[in-house]
Amino acid sequence: MRVSNVTVRKRLLFVLLFGVIVFLIIDTRLGYVQFVMGEKLTSLAKDSWSRNLPFEPERGEILDRNGVKLATNKSAPTVFVVPRQVQNPMKTSKQLAAVLNMSEEKVYKHVTKKASIEKITPEGRKISNEKAKEIKALDLKGVYVAEDSIRHYPFGSFLSHVLGFAGIDNQGLLGLEAYYDDDLKGEKGSVKFYTDAKGKKMPDEADDYTPPKDGLDMKLTVDSKVQTIMERELDNAEAKYHPDGMIAVAMNPKNGEILGMSSRPDFDPADYQSVDPSVYNRNLPVWSTYEPGSTFKIITLAAALEEQKVNLKRDQFYDKGHAEVDGARLRCWKRGGHGLQTYLEVVQNSCNPGFVELGERLGKEKLFKYIKDFGFGQKTGIDLQGEGTGILFPLERVGPVEQATTAFGQGVSVTPIQQVAAVSAAVNGGTLYTPYIAKEWIDPVTKKTVKKQSPIAKKQVISEETSKQIRYALESVVAEGTGRNAFVEGYRVGGKTGTAQKVKDGKYLENNHIVSFIGFAPADDPSLVVYVAVDNPKGTIQFGGTVAAPIVGNIMRDSLPELGVKPRKNQIEKKYQWNDTKTIEVPNVVGMSVSDLESLLVNLNVDASGKGSKIVKQSPAAGTKVKEGSKIRVYLTEEDEKEAAD
């Protein structure tokens, strides 16, 4: 049967159209693959025949306010293998095992593993530079040594709870290392090299290098000189009193900058695994909460002065040794009471019944308003992990007894950093600041500041006039009251003692107290606030004025000159008791002869250096006040040499 020409033409047209459609589909698909998916497919192809050797970034360094390095990095390379490139697995395993001090069997599992790239762990991670050089010298095919680092803390336990520590992957795990991990960690880089189907490196292909981006350096508000002084004083107190724990915080009251922070027990960040986790997990100055005791009376005093409920010099109070409140007898620490006092003396003597009276004058609404305005019952916002909030009575549950005990610092729970921030506000003119410890972030390459933290003023709590009265009252506490052991000649230290019974299972413990002192200086223009608390000191009377006040005094005495604070005049003279060591003024002995000293320095010990009888130099300088019995050093020369020098 013959097919007509028309039918043939129709069939040819159909085949042609079908071919065109198929061609268009294929062409469209090819175009889509080439132009739309091309980049993605190329990347996938490269990934299938490329290997990435990671390059770790340098973690940002942590510096004190003066540039002293507190946390740095040490080179610690890491060993990788590309199993397909290993030509002799047995030989490679034997040589690597010898250098890395591991079994040949374990290395063999790594070098023969079905993986594109394999890290030898843990023995091959963070190795010494000496071992890295040995491995490179072996020139083993498929074995690579990549640059890496470990965190280094050059001063050991110095500032340990604040700094925290980083893990083996240089990730922040605790403290500032964790809080600012995103800024410090940087971004990883790599070297990408290409391999053939057998995994062998292709020598004609250039490697792709993506450099790591190092983390930002971080400068703190901490002054390492102040921190060193605090650490020294805590070490001395620990050796003397064997306490259950200790806390110290130093802050600039004018802006909230933390100048130092320490606690005991402490730990070495590079060896944190050697101590119980409870030691490093608890940064006591921000985490711990306890009854503040008499240091809290500063808040009650501030509220009463601001509300004009008391005149320190005119108003009087008779202390019979206790106060009766709603059937409860609240005792003063002094048996038999202080008798008739002005309210300035109530503050100096830390008289509990006197502060119960101030609480009654204020009423619970006003008292608790100021307590909350000073930041208690809420986090301060300091840039450290694990900050506590403390515990306050709900206002609806505050009866006469709760109001009375709160007024002298019992029955409430606060953190040390809350107390430091609140007292700073009380003495700085009335402004409550957020404490902070990270000051600025610096590009490690350009050394330029990338960002900076500014002081945050939360609120004006009291007036400058009220703050002035508080400073005067607290300076008198140190000169004439319970804080005399914190007195520093020439620096006008003010402050308040605290002695609080510890609570366990809802009951107060006997002979187990947290004793504290919070001080500031100079009283005319405070530049430094220091808080010290000692938990259950042994072998001593457990009073804040006996144990904590001398520690704060020593910290103040050495820190203020380091901060550039000049000695002051118009200091309230210290009121001495029978057992106090008096201070005397060093006379000018330069130009005198040795024979003149016998009658002049009857209250001082003399240490002479040099030969001759004429004094050409002395230390300390004339006019300096020192404790009776202190040593004065004089430098001698022959009389004719002195005349020749003149």
From Swiss-Prot:
Top EC class for this record: hydrolase
Give the bilayer topology.
Answer: Peripheral membrane protein
In terms of one coarse class, where is the protein primarily found?
A: membrane
Catalytic residues at 294
In terms of SUPFAM superfamilies, this protein maps to: beta-lactamase/transpeptidase-like, Penicillin binding protein dimerisation domain, Penicillin-binding protein 2x (pbp-2x), c-terminal domain
Effect of loss of the gene = Asporogeneous; spore development starts but does not develop the spore cortex.
Alphabetized CDD domains for the sequence: PASTA
Keywords attached to this entry: Carboxypeptidase, Cell membrane, Cell shape, Cell wall biogenesis/degradation, Hydrolase, Membrane, Peptidoglycan synthesis, Protease, Sporulation
EC number of this enzyme? 3.4.16.4
> One Pfam family of this protein, by short name?
Transpeptidase
One GO CC term, this protein: plasma membrane
Supply the Gene3D superfamilies for this chain: 3.30.10.20, 3.30.450.330, DD-peptidase/beta-lactamase superfamily, Penicillin-binding protein 2a (Domain 2)
The cysteines joined by S-S bonds are none
Query: Which residue ranges does the record assign to the PASTA domain?
Result: 580-638
Q: Which reaction does it catalyse?
A: Preferential cleavage: (Ac)2-L-Lys-D-Ala-|-D-Ala. Also transpeptidation of peptidyl-alanyl moieties that are N-acyl substituents of D-alanine
- To which protein family does this belong? Belongs to the transpeptidase family.
Q: What does this protein do?
A: Penicillin-binding protein with an unknown catalytic activity. May have a specialized role in the morphogenesis of spore cortex, which is a modified form of peptidoglycan. Spore cortex formation is determined primarily by the mother cell.
- The protein depicted here goes by the name Stage V sporulation protein D
